[in-house]
């Protein structure tokens, strides 16, 4: 390895005034782009550079104008068994297109879900009946599952479902799915923007649209948090109890982070907390290192979601472990805010145990001001939970992005990007890197040892320019993955398809054709691209869902299908933040 400077000067790029900071050691990278081969990313002996993507077609659905798209990464799946993949594209309506761009099915806006579809839809056979299901969440507390039957979509029996709670019918902004209890059926977790006193933000549904209730559990498992006391209740857990507040941006992941065989539901909140729920709805206990400092509940244990996370590890040690010194003050120290911070689950250090990865914005001052985005890796509760919710060794000092330009109160559009952590091996040994688009205008790659490996400034000096979640795929069959993402802003022709090498070098920066005005929401690509071989010819298509002009499809000549470690939003069509580095 060879040291390489990063930052605005070294990269000759425009970025925010503050520089990013590394974690455990100096910023390093692999200048030759070397990456060890793994079973999930094999070479097809490709020997030519990545070819420039070729635009194929645009789709708008059942009308001449395009509905507004949000963060719902398209789903690419063979619905009818013909060897070609269809495109599931949620806007306000939900469209299904074939590989050639023809509209096959439409669920119109407000038919079953209200308003926009913000989060990526889950695409899976939920109940194992051989029929593909598509699950989408809307506003007004609505969630719907559809079945693909007889060449079209129909509402699945038992659906739509409701996420109404404590007098609010909020928007579903996050969705992830997985077989939580190992019975062969897939549960769907939905997180909402509920802010009511006593309101629940996390709902888990069975394939039949009913709230999930694991066998043998005597208390109502979901939704959470609840207002019950005693066994299975949240109101008096560890004495103090717990409550949540608003999940605003794809705030849910799923994965096994403890000693049993069941998967946990990982949720981040707008109250500076991150929680891990077991399948029965109860919370995972944090390590004994963390105890309550409040005089009323002094030395009581804490669950994952019962304490604010602070950026400085010494602050957390003094406050939650030693119980010494002044209580933390937001005016002088940064806390971690998880407002729109999707969690992913993966084995970062290669020890065979999963960690939780998130990129909260680190805030300070009153009113709160983001100082940067903190790449965070927390250990699970394996081995009896002795290090549960603690920082992975080497990650005590969190790698931090540059400071984004503050936005004025009420400046909502275009919306900030969602800092979803992509966890995949792009450099060096088989341990994964963390790649993410950050709202300081840069894409970051952070190594498993908490080193910032490289950054690429996608904004190039343009104000209020953001990027989608990236995807990681090999586009020239050499077994070395590329990074693919889109950009958006409010400016004319802000939408671009960008492709980087695994070392962060720009390969292509392509303005999208036929861009619109975005209706004041945004212009370009807010949702993660999706990449697959749509038409069965052995080469890959890149599918982009846009704010302003529908769905664009590009083909990449000379590409292959043997290395697609993170090909769609949140890693897979279950949208649960799992990739090849996840340990089942």
Regions found by a protein language model. Name each.
Residues 1-36:
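Ser/Thr-rich, Pro/Gly/Ala-heavy low-complexity intrinsically disordered linkers and tails
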Residues 30-584:
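Extracytoplasmic/lumenal domain signature
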